[in-house]
């Protein structure tokens, strides 16, 4: 039985990446050591981390005046690290189009009780269960604000921002965990981008931060571990980094570049692959996708429901038994969610659609 992993993260990794990692696991390039055990100060790992950065720069067209940092703590740590480094004494706006955006705003509010800055909720679609990307009047944004924070892909609710909003000249900070490398963005449109690896980059445990040099903090922070400037100047080696995770991420970057053909080709594949499922759901009177506007649909996370919660539960159970794993929707919204990240095979979407048709015929 073929197993398809629809997990929202950690998620499917490219098979060629896993095979290469397997082949090199015990003896990395005749070093006599595994990457799991080699020093982060060794020449071998120095090449790994530098090659990882170089390939990511090429894939995303990252300009020279941006730093790339490999950190730990997941995107959730960035909810605190961003305002701690960038917002002191200023306003910071939050566009909340999903649960993770709300968590970022909530952490900022919590931090503002200790550090002097003003987090402001710019707009939210929470009242409609985040079924769309909220709009706002850019003239309401103070042009002297530190940043506008947004989430480019809402993993739980299945919405994305593809065209960046007008922010009245205020720099944009983007949480890009779940659609980085799956859609093309102009890095120069952002002051800072952060992304947890466990969806489109690699295994959980490493977080990529891309930050414009003039946006690096001037003042020392409460902790060196939470200080962008210190981390950047140390080349991601202020302390021992998650070496194996960075190595796997490098292999994924190589896969996107050499086997897929780059981000633009990857984005094309994602649009076509997700479109297969969206088209079927639209053609069905049994399944529903909750996203209000088609233009906001995610190419990575596709939530859907049947006519009842009982049928949803039955669908999940039968799907799991047939090898469609981790398709249950997030506990906050229920239903189902097909996370079809970059490494998820197109055939898995086709097989899921076949099962959905069969389930519909048997239960409508």
From Swiss-Prot:
Subunit-level organization: Homodimer.
Organism per entry: Streptococcus thermophilus (strain ATCC BAA-250 / LMG 18311)
Stated name of the protein: Phosphoserine aminotransferase
Name of encoding gene: serC
Keyword match Manganese: no
Reactions this protein catalyses: O-phospho-L-serine + 2-oxoglutarate = 3-phosphooxypyruvate + L-glutamate; 4-(phosphooxy)-L-threonine + 2-oxoglutarate = (R)-3-hydroxy-2-oxo-4-phosphooxybutanoate + L-glutamate
Keyword Transferase included in the entry's annotation: yes
Keywords attached to this entry: Amino-acid biosynthesis, Aminotransferase, Cytoplasm, Pyridoxal phosphate, Pyridoxine biosynthesis, Serine biosynthesis, Transferase
Lineage, top ranks: Bacteria, Bacillati, Bacillota, Bacilli, Lactobacillales
HAMAP family attached to this UniProt entry: SerC_aminotrans_5 (MF_00160)
Pfam families: Aminotran_5 (PF00266)
């Amino acid at each position: 039985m073929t197993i398809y992993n629809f997990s929202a993260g950690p998620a499917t990794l490219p098979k060629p990446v896993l095979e290469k990692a397997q082949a090199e696991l015990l003896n990395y390039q005749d070093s006599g050591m595994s990457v799991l055990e080699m020093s982060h100060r060794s020449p071998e790992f120095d090449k790994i981390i530098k090659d990882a950065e170089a390939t990511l720069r090429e894939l995303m067209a990252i300009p020279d005046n941006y730093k790339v940092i490999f950190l730990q703590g997941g995107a959730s740590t960035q909810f605190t690290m961003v305002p701690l480094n960038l917002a002191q004494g200023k306003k910071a706006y939050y566009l909340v189009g999903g649960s993770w955006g709300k968590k970022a705003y909530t952490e900022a509010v919590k931090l503002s009780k200790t550090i002097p800055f003003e987090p402001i909720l710019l707009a939210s679609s929470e009242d409609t269960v985040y079924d769309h990307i909220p709009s706002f009047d850019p003239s309401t944004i103070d042009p002297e604000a530190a940043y506008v924070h947004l989430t480019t892909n809402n993993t739980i609710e299945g919405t994305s921002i593809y065209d960046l909003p007008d922010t009245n000249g205020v720099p944009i900070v983007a949480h890009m965990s779940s659609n980085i490398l799956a859609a093309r963005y102009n890095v120069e449109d952002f002051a800072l981008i952060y992304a947890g690896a466990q969806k489109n980059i690699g295994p959980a445990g490493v977080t990529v931060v891309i930050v414009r040099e003039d946006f690096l903090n001037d003042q020392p922070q409460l902790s060196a571990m939470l200080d962008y400037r210190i981390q950047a100047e140390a080349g991601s080696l202020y302390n021992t980094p998650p070496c194996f995770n960075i190595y796997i991420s490098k292999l994924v970057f190589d896969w996107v570049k050499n086997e897929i053909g780059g981000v633009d080709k990857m984005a094309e594949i994602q649009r076509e692959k997700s479109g297969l499922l969206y088209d079927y759901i639209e053609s069905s009177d049994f399944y529903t996708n909750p996203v209000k506007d088609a233009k906001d649909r995610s190419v990575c996370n596709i939530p859907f429901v049947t006519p009842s919660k009982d049928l949803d539960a039955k669908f999940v159970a039968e799907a799991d038994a047939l090898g469609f794993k981790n398709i249950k929707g997030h506990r906050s919204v229920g239903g189902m969610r097909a996370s079809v990240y970059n490494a998820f095979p197109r055939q898995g979407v086709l097989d899921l659609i076949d099962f959905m048709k069969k389930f519909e015929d048997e239960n409508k």
